Design a protein with these regions (language model features):
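Alpha/beta-hydrolase-fold enzymes
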Residues: 138, 142-228
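Catalytic active-site module of serine/aspartate enzymes centered on a nucleophile-bearing elbow/loop
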Residues: 294-331
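Alpha/beta-hydrolase active-site loop
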Residues: 104-124
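Short beta-strand element of the alpha/beta-hydrolase
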Residues: 54-63
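Alpha/beta-hydrolase fold nucleophile elbow
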Residues: 125-137
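Serine-hydrolase catalytic core
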Residues: 193-295
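Conserved alpha/beta-hydrolase
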Residues: 66-69, 74, 78-98
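N-terminal cap/lid segment of alpha/beta-hydrolase-fold proteins
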Residues: 1-51
Length: 331
């Protein structure tokens, strides 16, 4: 669905950020109640297509129970010569305001419609000829599935702690997945737990200014506790993670970044501020081999799950690693 007639409006981040609503086809079985996504970018990006501010661009995909607010990440890309765009997917973030069940998406491929439209806007309307897809956590899984399904649409992938497998032992993953698959067919809206889900509350407390952290995001859009994990959502995630394990054959260069250490729900706030308490970094590293033939893995000491929200030294190392890699791979 083309959104060429949709105007830009001031974004919640304030100037120079603007938001553009992307209407999408409703899908009651895959993303009930969701009818739009929101593309966020700086006002200067929407200049004449013949003369974009930067020829290269990045499209950022957020994680579960998340939205785009990391303006320092955007600034790092802008300073490196990339226009920055972020897509709050249907039922998520800005596009989930007023939604009965935010982030209740049972097949991530339903997001293909808004990703396709965002890329059309970036390339055709705004005139960028090189586009990088940057995904965090669930957004990282979204990014690799998109790149595998739609070769030639993006020029590189940057993955920030991508969710490539379910945390836990092989036994937990096998039996847990079978149970979730069965439950999702009977009651996809059933709220369930998952290994690691409790860690996210400790994670938020370690990062948000209300508790012990540095950051001040909107807790209505990225709450603590996080939005419920539902059976339909997790079953959909597991289907795609199995595809990853079978091999995706992505044909563009991929950078996978993650912390050096994982921790559990029992981690102290201090430990949560310098490790990944959501995913297993060893799993991330192992599953990265199935993405394609050109994969670079970079671990960030004392990085948190969203590496862009790590402490100052780890954050700087992550951003520097990304920009150096892009400079090396995209001449």
């Amino acid at each position: 669905m083309s959104a060429t007639s949709e105007p830009t409006t001031p974004d919640i981040l304030g100037e120079p950020w603007v938001a553009r609503r992307i209407p999408v086809t409703e899908s009651p079985t895959k993303a009930p109640g969701a009818d739009h996504a929101v593309l966020v970018f700086q006002r200067e990006a929407a200049g004449r297509a013949s003369r974009p501010r930067h020829s290269r661009a990045v499209l950022y995909l957020h994680g579960r129970s998340d939205y785009f607010f990391q303006t320092h990440l955007a600034q790092a890309y802008l300073d490196a010569g990339f226009e920055f765009y972020a897509l709050d997917l249907r039922a998520c973030g800005r596009a989930g305001v007023g939604h009965a069940s935010p982030h209740d998406v049972r097949d991530l491929r339903v997001h293909d419609e808004e990703i396709s439209e965002a890329l059309r806007i970036i390339r055709s309307e705004h005139g960028h000829d090189v586009v990088v897809l940057n995904g965090h956590s669930t957004g990282g899984l979204q990014a690799v599935i998109w790149a595998a399904d739609h070769p030639g649409t993006v020029d590189a992938l940057v993955l920030n702690s991508p969710w490539l497998d379910l945390r836990g032992s092989a036994l937990v993953r096998s039996y847990g997945s079978a149970f979730v698959d069965l439950l999702s067919r009977r009651d996809p809206e059933r709220v369930i737990g998952e290994p690691g889900s409790g860690d996210e509350d400790n994670y938020v407390a370690a990062l948000h200014r209300r508790w012990r952290g540095e950051w001040d995001w909107d807790l209505a859009l990225k709450p603590a506790p996080s939005f419920p994990v539902r059976a339909g959502f997790l079953a959909g995630i597991r289907r795609l993670q199995r595809e990853v394990h079978h091999g995706l054959g992505i044909r563009v260069p991929i950078l996978v970044c993650c912390s050096t250490v994982s921790n559990s729900v029992k981690a102290t706030l201090e430990e949560a501020q310098r490790s990944d308490v959501v995913l297993d970094v060893e799993q991330i590293i192992d599953r990265s081999q199935y993405l394609g033939d050109d994969v670079t893995v970079r671990q960030i000491p004392e990085g948190v799950h969203d590496l862009a929200l790590s402490g100052p030294l780890a954050r700087a190392e992550y951003l520097q690693a990304v920009m150096r890699w892009l400079d090396n791979r995209l001449h």
